[in-house]
Amino acid sequence: MAAAIRAPRLGQIADGLAAAVAVSLPWSTSATSILIVLWIIAVVPTLDVASVRREVMSPAGGLPVLLWALGAFGMLWADVSWSERIAGLSGFHKLLVIPLLLAQFRRSPHADWVILGFLASSVVLLVVSWALMLTPGLSWRGRELGVPVKNYILQSAIFAICAFGLFGQAAELWRTRPRLAVMLLVLAAAFIANIGYVATARTTLVVLGVMAVLFGLRQFGWKGAVGACLVGAVLTGAVWASSPYLRARVSVAVEQVRNYGTSDVDTPVGLRFEYWKKSLAFVAEAPVIGHGTGTIPALFRRDATAETIPSLITTNPHSQILTVAVQLGILGTAALIAMWIAHLALFRDGTQVAWLGLVLVTYNVVSSLFNSHLFDFGQGWLYVFGVGLTGGMVLRRASIETWDKP
């Protein structure tokens, strides 16, 4: 009897800790790390072997585990020290959490805690960001204007995901609760405006275009996608005309592309091109199984000459696909792409939760063309918790509907 009483309580504690992780994610790496450990300690006793096995045997839960396993085996043929191999595997570890989250939120009725906690935390971050931008002399510990914590890359990613999640919710509520829908649209516009006027990553600008087309396609079909492109073009033109910050961000990137190969490559865009070029050469050396886990720093050191600038010796090729391909070859790349496809397939229905999951996966897939976001701390955990949470909610809904059928 005592065990039966403790189990639901422990389950609620695990749900609460998952919500706490979501709240902390936009703000603090240290707090997020501590809360993730506490969440794992709380959630593991609430899961039975059968439920975890069910998720591991499914594509959505099993392919992340497979990718981690390939990373672990990849240490065996890596020609670097064991400390470098272990460091290389560290980015893969978070993938093991996805089956646990799927199992937890397939069963838990408290997934809304996590979503609302993350949204509330992001709204507070949005308010602080705008306050820093609009109030000269107001100080914060952030190093960049309008970016109170962490960095503009993660902040703009969070704001983009929140904005399109709110767009989806507003579209769903438009007929039944129009006032609430308008409020959600205003909040979404505030997130988008922050990206355009305050702080953004150039990758986020690319992802916004993809998400706009996806939103139009999902809500209104191919005509909606065309409409989204037209509306997006008009809004982009308006923001471009009124935002010196956005013009400067894009103009600098365009100038760096033009100057690449004819002048100094030591620019963010130039370095990316060099990382990609060298990474493709490394992949060609070991195309099937790669050079092994943790070998990226050693490969860039090996390729360096006396004239090589220090910034060209990196641990991160700034492409998720190339990061995996260099270490695990075609085999690892196939597992990565299969995982993304499985997660996209998980969110193929028309519910609002599925839309939110689709937004999370789309952001990670598109941004990973330009960054190794799955292995980064903030973006990686955002993906893992987002997919695990929304995937569990989709599976729970499907289970209930199946159970209710005569």
Positions of predicted regions on the chain:
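Transmembrane signal-anchor hairpin modules in multi-pass inner-membrane enzymes, especially those
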Residues: 1-86, 96, 103-116, 169-183, ...
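Hydrophobic core segments of transmembrane alpha-helices in multi-pass, intramembrane catalytic enzymes
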Residues: 32-43, 87-99, 153-169, 203-215, ...
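Transmembrane alpha-helices of multi-pass inner-membrane enzymes
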Residues: 37-44, 212, 339, 357-365, ...
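Alpha-helical transmembrane segments of multi-pass inner-membrane proteins
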Residues: 72, 100, 110-141, 149-220, ...
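Hydrophobic transmembrane alpha-helices and their immediate junctions
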Residues: 217, 327-362
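Long extracytoplasmic/lumenal interhelical loops at the membrane interface
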Residues: 262-277, 285, 289-328
